[in-house]
Amino acid sequence: MGANQLVVLNVYDMYWMNEYTSSIGIGVFHSGIEVYGREFAYGGHPYPFSGIFEISPGNASELGETFKFKEAVVLGSTDFLEDDIEKIVEELGKEYKGNAYHLMHKNCNHFSSALSEILCGKEIPRWINRLAYFSSCIPFLQSCLPKEWLTPAALQSSVSQELQDELEEAEDAAASASMGSASAGSRPGRHTKL
């Protein structure tokens, strides 16, 4: 076991939306979990790979111009090592895929709560995800909030990099396959499995 590392919930105000929702006592917040000087968060995109991304802790500018840092909430501590946390985040990425994002049922705050429960045994404070709870009771609210407005810019960058990596891997595999089949053709009796 490692040293006790603080587990911190960084909360960001989506200030342009809160101008409308604060009058009814509901804020719209983005959150991420900070541990070992790294912050992990979740957002949506249309692809079937992880929607989890990493930013510099508390840096709202990496999320985009509509986000403002609100506060840091210490949730507890963890004895997991940094390598363990990377594995946990990778495993959570199988559940928190970009195309599984749903504003009311699987959003950044749900991810933060899941990671916090694993790391220190505590959920995030309920007020942070209050909008998801209330809007699940009032279905028309879901249609009032476009999903693309709530995808942090840092995630867009992460998605672009993931797509570029997949494209390069596909090109490398295609080049290897064509080289392999060309050389396989010159050897009698050899079969190339694609």
Curated annotation (Swiss-Prot):
Its main location: cytoplasm. The active site is at H30, C108. InterPro entries: PPPDE_dom (IPR008580), PPPDE_sf (IPR042266). Residues 163-172 have a biased composition (Acidic residues). Residues 173-186 have a biased composition (Low complexity). Its EC number is 3.4.19.12, 3.1.2.22. Interacts with RPS7. Gene3D superfamilies: PPPDE domains. Residues 5-149 form the PPPDE domain. The keyword Chloroplast does not apply. This is Deubiquitinase DESI2. It catalyses: Thiol-dependent hydrolysis of ester, thioester, amide, peptide and isopeptide bonds formed by the C-terminal Gly of ubiquitin (a 76-residue protein attached to proteins as an intracellular targeting signal); S-hexadecanoyl-L-cysteinyl-[protein] + H2O = L-cysteinyl-[protein] + hexadecanoate + H(+). Has deubiquitinating activity towards 'Lys-48'- and 'Lys-63'-linked polyubiquitin chains. Deubiquitinates 'Lys-48'-linked polyubiquitination of RPS7 leading to its stabilization. Exhibits palmitoyl protein thioesterase (S-depalmitoylation) activity towards synthetic substrates 4-methylumbelliferyl-6-S-palmitoyl-beta-D-glucopyranoside and S-depalmitoylation probe 5 (DPP-5). One of its GO terms (cellular component) is cytoplasm. It is an enzyme of class 3 (hydrolase). Keywords: Cytoplasm, Hydrolase, Protease, Ubl conjugation pathway. One of its GO terms (biological process) is proteolysis. Belongs to the DeSI family. It comes from Sus scrofa (Pig). One of its GO terms (molecular function) is K63-linked deubiquitinase activity. SMART domains: DUF862 (SM01179). It is found in: Cytoplasm. The keyword Cytoplasm applies. Residues 161-194 are annotated as: Disordered.
